[in-house]
Amino acid sequence: MSAPAPKADIPGALCPSRPGDPRGKLRIMSQPAKNQQKDGDLTGLRKGEIAVELPAKFDASLYFIGRIRTPWQTRDECPKNGRETEEVCTIELDPRWAAGLQGLETVSHMLVLYWMDKARRDLVLQSPRHYAEHRGTFALRSPVRPNPIAAAVTRLKRIEGNKLFVVGLDCMDGTPLIDLKPYFASTDSAPDASVGWHSARKR
């Protein structure tokens, strides 16, 4: 009897690896948010915003290595950025990656990369509420972007097992975690950095 045909990849599922797949026994497929707009959806656009049709397929897959626990259940509850809050949030790392934390307890600050899974992904021109003019997606720090990856420099309070307690996050509870990196002030800081349109807005 011939072997049954493999099932199609299901978003969000843990799928057996394909023969010869070097990534191991399980592959984690990314899962679209339940309330995410469909590709190229014109609903919910503000005046002047432009949405495009998203590519038919992804070029790479991600492993979500954990979840972020915060006090905020909706986007409106979240602080505008992590420096506006002193709330201690918890990063729950999947136990399989726990050995990767060795040495991280010695750092004071770390860079947290996370996936804004509730954000739409098809806008190329946006009209942010707090800006009078339209801006291109890549000129903004908005979570709305083709790949909704967010980055935050956080202050590490302590590590307990596979849980990290940090200050400086601004995301909703349950946000998927992509990566953790130590923050090096010597190479990661750019004191002379500027964003011209933002500086002009403050004048």
Model-derived features: where do they sit?
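Small-side-chain structural scaffolding
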Residues: 3-8, 13, 66, 150-152
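Glycine-rich, low-complexity intrinsically disordered segments
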Residues: 30-153, 157-203
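Intrinsically disordered, low-complexity serine/threonine-rich segments
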Residues: 1-3, 9, 15-28
